[in-house]
Structures are given as structure tokens and as C-alpha cells.
């Protein structure tokens, strides 16, 4: 059933890990609930770092969330009473999430999504770049580089304390023990190919 409201839009919150994306999502959701709006919060089932059924920020704040394995499952949980739809860790969804949020916004819902805009390689992550392009509002947050204290826009993956290879799997859900924020200069990706076909291992840091 197509439920039409008067106006709808898409908000994207993005940035590196530890930049406060989930915290900002939680803040916006709580403001909406204070205004007596009905909010439905969703997360991918793959994200179970802190809880299977909650959005949890790195500082411990949380919201009850509905875990879904497919973007289209979101339609099963909303109704004409729903005002706001919030989706955390959106980078873990398939590209189907793009059509889903477009449809929801077109139907008049306020849609808020949060996720990583770059993977651990420093490359665009899943559907997030497209969501940024079609959104009415984009908030890009930065963390603090753990090496030098500069603004950090990248996520460093560490395996046993060593930077992960470019050829490691892109999706590996972790928390502080496996990731940390880095600036452009201190972000390390061993084996990353350069334009001339070589790896970047020989580059001076």
C-alpha cells in the first residue's frame, strides 16, 4: 500500500568510525520523539557489536532498533502513523537500500541514515556515496586522528596491531580493538595499488 504524506526528505550522516555518527542519529531521533513523532529505527543484522536489537554509540548511548537482513523488510514495519525512519550502519546494506529510501522519502517520510562513507581502504563504501548524492541534507563528521590529533576522515583497520592489507575483506564488523580513526597522512593501507600498478608499500611516511 502506498502511503503518501505531505513532504519527505533524506538526511545522511557520514564519516569515519568514532566520529559520532550513531550519536548524532540518536540525538535526531530523540528530538523527534520529544516532538511526539513516531519513529522507527532499523539496523542491519550484521551489526551486532554491542547489541542485536539496539543502535549503540561508542560512548554507550542507545536506542531500540529493528534488525533487518534486507532493505525491503523495512516496509513491513512502518505504517501511516510513522513519521521518521532512522537507519544506522547503512553501508552494510545492499544497493537495494537506495531505492528503499527514495521510495520512503517520496511517500513523505523523513528518512535519516548514518554510515561510513569510506571503507578501511579509504574508498567509497557501498551505497553511501549514492545516498549522499540524492539526499537533501548531508552531515559529514570527523573524528580525531589517534596518531597526531588532526581531524580524521578515515578508518584504520588493525589486525593484531598491524595495518590490514588492501586485499583483506571489506566487511569485518569490529569496535575499538580492530579500528581507529586516522587522518589522511597517517592512514595506512599496505598493498594498495597505485596508478602505475605498483603497491604503496614503498612510499615514505
Curated annotation (Swiss-Prot):
Molecular function GO terms recorded: ATP binding; thymidine kinase activity; zinc ion binding
Residue ranges with Polar residues bias: 195-205
Subcellular location: Cytoplasm
GO BP terms, alphabetized: DNA biosynthetic process; thymidine metabolic process
List of residues binding Zn(2+): 145, 148, 183, 186
Transmembrane segments: none
Keywords: ATP-binding, Cytoplasm, DNA synthesis, Kinase, Metal-binding, Nucleotide-binding, Transferase, Zinc
EC numbers: 2.7.1.21
Catalytic activity: thymidine + ATP = dTMP + ADP + H(+)
Record-level GO cellular component terms: cytosol
Binding-site list for ATP: 15-22, 88-91
Active site: 89 (proton acceptor)
Family annotation (Pfam families): TK
Disordered: region residues: 182-205
Domain of life: Bacteria
Enzyme class at the top of the EC tree: transferase
Family (UniProt): Belongs to the thymidine kinase family.
Family annotation (NCBIfam families): PRK04296.1-1 (NF003296)
Subunit-structure text: Homotetramer.
PANTHER family assigned: THYMIDINE KINASE, THYMIDINE KINASE, CYTOSOLIC
Name the UniProt record assigns to this protein: Thymidine kinase
Organism: Geobacillus sp. (strain WCH70)
Amino acid at each position: 500500500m502506498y502511503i503518501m504524506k505531505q513532504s519527505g526528505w533524506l538526511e545522511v550522516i557520514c564519516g569515519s568510525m568514532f566520529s559520532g555518527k550513531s550519536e548524532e542519529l540518536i540525538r535526531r531521533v530523540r528530538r523527534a520523539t520529544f516532538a511526539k513523532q513516531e519513529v522507527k529505527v532499523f539496523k542491519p543484522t550484521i551489526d551486532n557489536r554491542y547489541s542485536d536489537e539496539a543502535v549503540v554509540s561508542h560512548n554507550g548511548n542507545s536506542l531500540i532498533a529493528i534488525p533487518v537482513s534486507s532493505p525491503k523488510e523495512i516496509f513491513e514495519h512502518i505504517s501511516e502513523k510513522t513519521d521518521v525512519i532512522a537507519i544506522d550502519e547503512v553501508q552494510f546494506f545492499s544497493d537495494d537500500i537506495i531505492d528503499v529510501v527514495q521510495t520512503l522519502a517520496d511517500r513523505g517520510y523523513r528518512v535519516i541514515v548514518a554510515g561510513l562513507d569510506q571503507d578501511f581502504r579509504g574508498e567509497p563504501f557501498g551505497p553511501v556515496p549514492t545516498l549522499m548524492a540524492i539526499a537533501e541534507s548531508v552531515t559529514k563528521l570527523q573524528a580525531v586522528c589517534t596518531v597526531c590529533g588532526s581531524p580524521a576522515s578515515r578508518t584504520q583497520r588493525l589486525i593484531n596491531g598491524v595495518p590490514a592489507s588492501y586485499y583483506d575483506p571489506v566487511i569485518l564488523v569490529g569496535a575499538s580493538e580492530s579500528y581507529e580513526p586516522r587522518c589522511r597522512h597517517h592512514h595506512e593501507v599496505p598493498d594498495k595499488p597505485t596508478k602505475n600498478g605498483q603497491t604503496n608499500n614503498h612510499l615514505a611516511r
